[in-house]
Amino acid sequence: MATLQEKLITPIVAGSTTPNNKITVVGVGQVGMACAISILGKGLCDELALVDVLEDKLKGEMMDLQHGSLFLQTHKIVADKDLRVTANSKIVVVTAGVRQQEGESRLNLVQRNVNVFKFIIPQIMKYSPNCTILVVSNPVDILTYVTWKLSGLPKHRVIGSGCNLDSARFRHLMAEKLGIHPTSCHGWILGEHGDSSVAVWSGVNVAGVSLQELNPAMGTDKDSENWKEVHKMVVDSAYEVIKLKGYTNWAIGLSVADLIESYVKNLCRVHPVSTMVKGMYGIENEVFLSLPCVLSASGLTSVINQKLKDEEVAQLRKSADTLWSIQKDLKDL
């Protein structure tokens, strides 16, 4: 006897079983779920996979999102602690790891998270060998390097979320001070996503007008308007939010979706993300730092040769040295 489905639907041809734009988020903590909802809100995938070691939390998050699928463009949301569920992913977003504690430097997190990655990354490659990996876990620059080493992927397919959020914070804070919209205020934070990041004051502009030409002391200790404080606020902002609410999640989630949109839609937009910088600006070691990079459907396709002042280059090299001093001691990569 025919089922209700058979009575209702007459099949014409077998549907596709392989997703076109499958995205996986590894880690369903505060950051992972903020990434997931931001990706879904932009309609960037036809299938979303969630992975975590906490089964009840994982199932609960999956069900909660599934119940909202009527209001989304993505109806297939799956989850499992087994990374097999990630098979055929186009992008894998890695947010897994131990959480940064109040007052803890991102660099202090490194060894605990390296051990987590040694399990996750080989599994990702087993099930999605053609994927691009976007690393979000902190310290993001070192863990992007770790991912690159463990995955065996070419460097254009391993990207760190890097200073995309730092630059957004920078533009927001400057725009507030100037009374204009952040999209009209252009500025870049490069280097480490963290305490040694570099504010490129020489490139800050509004409508093409260099702010440093209007105020040559901008970003220095001699500046009566104390614009240097804006960069300090960028560096301290994550610590401030963690102090107030215990973690950061919404801004990084939105930032990650912004990066994925450039990839999925082949937009060729320029983002400050973490990439392998050996040979650039006199950096001699294999470190990942944020530089302005073009993101397209092929991954991270090129780096913009931003004209930096000597002191900015020196800061960038110092940022590289800071990371290498920890990276060089990592074992089993």
Curated annotation (Swiss-Prot):
SUPFAM superfamilies: LDH C-terminal domain-like, NAD(P)-binding Rossmann-fold domains. NAD(+) binds at residues 29-57, 99, 138. GO terms for molecular function: L-lactate dehydrogenase activity. Gene3D superfamilies: Lactate dehydrogenase/glycoside hydrolase, family 4, C-terminal (3.90.110.10), NAD(P)-binding Rossmann-like Domain (3.40.50.720). GO terms for biological process: lactate metabolic process. InterPro entries: L-lactate/malate_DH, L-lactate_DH, L-lactate_DH_AS, Lactate/malate_DH_C, Lactate/malate_DH_N, Lactate_DH/Glyco_Ohase_4_C, NAD(P)-bd_dom_sf. It holds the Pfam family Ldh_1_N. It catalyses: (S)-lactate + NAD(+) = pyruvate + NADH + H(+). Keywords: Cytoplasm, NAD, Oxidoreductase. Substrate binds at R106, N138, R169, T248. The active site is at H193. CDD domains: LDH_1. HAMAP family: Lactate_dehydrog. Belongs to the LDH/MDH superfamily. LDH family. Interconverts simultaneously and stereospecifically pyruvate and lactate with concomitant interconversion of NADH and NAD(+). This is L-lactate dehydrogenase B chain.
